[in-house]
A protein has these predicted regions:
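Post-Walker A helix-loop "phosphate-sensing" segment adjacent to the P-loop in P-loop NTPases
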Residues: 106-118
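Conserved NTP phosphate-binding and transfer environment spanning the P-loop NTPase/kinase superfamily
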Residues: 2-23, 29-44, 51, 199-307
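Short mixed-charge
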Residues: 65-80, 245-259
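Short coil/loop residues immediately preceding or within conserved phosphate-binding loops
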Residues: 84
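Glycine-rich phosphate-binding loop used to anchor ATP phosphates in small-molecule kinases
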Residues: 69, 77, 81, 150-211, ...
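Glycine-rich phosphate-binding P-loop
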Residues: 87-106
Length: 307
């Protein structure tokens, strides 16, 4: 472990794994296969060495937060509304954010102090395609201006104000759009994980969703590796989800390998890589914890901000 001269403590994977202590493994291989995303390699050892120690750390933070509320209630002489602990997870497209969010949701829900853990992706707060097309920014989908930032902030602010019932919009990856007639209901969770590309954004004036986070994670990797993962995922989707006639990207289903790779490379270079460098990568240093992945999608180093 080192971290001299930086606001972070830096751990090798082995050093981080040792911090698991006696935390029990509560997931088996079937659970992990169910949780992991498309083209994301995730083993039992990865969960044991990386995510169990992280769940232990988060459990300690959540317990401390709960104890602080108890102290405040004692001071005020009356109980206050229960407020969830909010964790943000950021990083590029195809870096594995969603898989990490689901793993943490499962692990954290198995701790006795906070059995209710909800997961919300910011995709639901994208403007509908019709709005993006009207504004001429459909090609900027996923960039900060394509999100209903105020709606997202209102949602998280409602959570942190202790409202007993909060609703979030629902996004369909098949339709590649927000579903106008569906809402996700969240009722009195102990923890809420919010996962999205730009959730650590905080430049300029005004409020940002990251202002409401109690803990934040940035999933980091070499951009060349992320591009490879994106292309591999595109090829897998071509052979699976894109085959559905109702899929927004059904037009890609009949591409051969060379055509699919060329199209995925174009999309990466023109959209996702630009978004990474312009809007996502610079938010890395705002995270409480950084998970650094290697080319095989496995976490090689962990950086924890000094508190």
């Amino acid at each position: 472990m080192n971290g001299d001269g930086t606001p972070y403590l830096d751990f090798s994977r082995a050093e981080w794994a040792a911090l698991r202590a006696a935390t029990p493994m509560t997931l088996d291989e079937r659970d992990i296969d169910r949780i992991k995303g498309i083209n994301v390699e995730l083993s039992v050892s990865e969960v044991e060495q990386v995510y169990l120690p992280l769940s232990r750390l988060l459990n300690l933070y959540v317990r401390a937060s709960q104890q602080l509320f108890t102290v405040t209630d004692t001071f005020l002489g009356k109980p206050s509304d229960r407020v969830p602990y909010v964790i943000g997870i950021a990083g590029s497209v195809a870096v594995g954010k969603s898989t990490i969010a689901r793993i943490l949701q499962e692990l954290l829900a198995n701790w006795p102090d906070h059995p209710s853990v909800d997961l919300v992706t910011t995709d639901g707060f994208l403007y509908r395609n019709a709005v993006l097309e009207k504004r001429g920014i459909m090609h900027r989908k996923g960039f900060p201006e394509s999100f209903d930032r105020r709606g997202l902030i209102r949602f998280v602010a409602a959570l942190k104000s202790g409202q007993p019932r909060v609703e979030a919009p629902v996004y369909s990856h098949l339709a590649y759009d927000v579903l106008p007639d569906q809402r996700r209901v969240i009722e009195r969770p102990d923890i809420v994980i919010i996962e999205g590309l730009n959730v650590l954004q905080g430049r300029g004036t005004g409020s940002y969703v990251s202002d409401f986070f109690d803990f934040s994670i940035y999933v980091d990797a070499d951009p060349a590796d992320i591009e490879n993962w994106y292309i591999d995922r595109f090829l897998t989707l071509r052979d699976t989800a894109f085959k559905d006639p109702g899929a927004y990207f059904h037009r890609y289903a009949d591409l051969d390998d060379d055509e699919a790779r060329a199209e995925a490379h174009r999309i990466w270079k023109e959209i996702n890589e630009v978004n990474l460098y312009e809007n996502i990568l610079h938010t890395r240093e705002r995270a409480t914890l950084i998970l650094k992945k290697g080319s095989a999608h496995d976490v090689e180093r962990v950086r924890l901000r000094r508190r």
